[in-house]
Amino acid sequence: MVSRWEKLKNNPQTKSIGISIFLMMITRVIDFSRPSLLWPLRILYATVNIVQIGIFLYTKIIIEKKNDLTVLKYVEPATPMSGREHSKFVATTVRDYDLSKLLTSFKQMLVTIATTLFMHLYMGYAPPLLLQSVSAARGLFDNSEVQIHVQNKPAIDELRRPFKSSGGLLGSFGQVLTDKKSVDEAELTKLKPT
């Protein structure tokens, strides 16, 4: 039986929070106004993002090359942010599911890059460059698609499709249902497949 401490210690969100707190303490000590420190930090940030984009594109190529057309059926619960009142039946292929999740992660990465660049270039803050360089590298290897297709981890437990929501702020509103009863019921009632 896994203890709560082990679960907490192995949780990627907990690790990210711990690393962020540690880096925030470091940023209070470092003088980011020195050009001898600022330019290498900018180069590090640009390099991490270029590598991240490259790995996302490489993962996309691998997914398309595998072309896994296994049918994946699940019921997506309605959440306050989805704008739907009822659950939605989804029938797709593993390939399309993986590509859609990878695209979602890619869009999140672009929003993070835009926010960080705005804070650095317009507002003049340098610490986000360090924080995002480290968290981007960590987040990339915590990405389910990268773990399955680049690191060749088996798609079991946490990596089983459809992926469980991360739990975050709205994760408690419902998980994706994959049990046969829920899927059959949704298919029969035709909850508008996508």
Curated annotation (Swiss-Prot):
It is a multi-pass membrane protein. The gene is pho88. It comes from the Eukaryota. May function in a SRP (signal recognition particle) and GET (guided entry of tail-anchored proteins) independent pathway for targeting a broad range of substrate proteins to the endoplasmic reticulum. Involved in inorganic phosphate uptake. Also involved in telomere length regulation and maintenance. GO terms for cellular component: endoplasmic reticulum membrane. InterPro entries: SND3_fun. It comes from Schizosaccharomyces pombe (strain 972 / ATCC 24843). One of its GO terms (biological process) is phosphate ion transport. Keywords: Endoplasmic reticulum, Membrane, Phosphate transport, Transmembrane, Transmembrane helix, Transport. It is found in: Endoplasmic reticulum membrane. Belongs to the PHO88 family. This is SRP-independent targeting protein 3 homolog. The chain crosses the membrane at residues 43-63, 110-130.
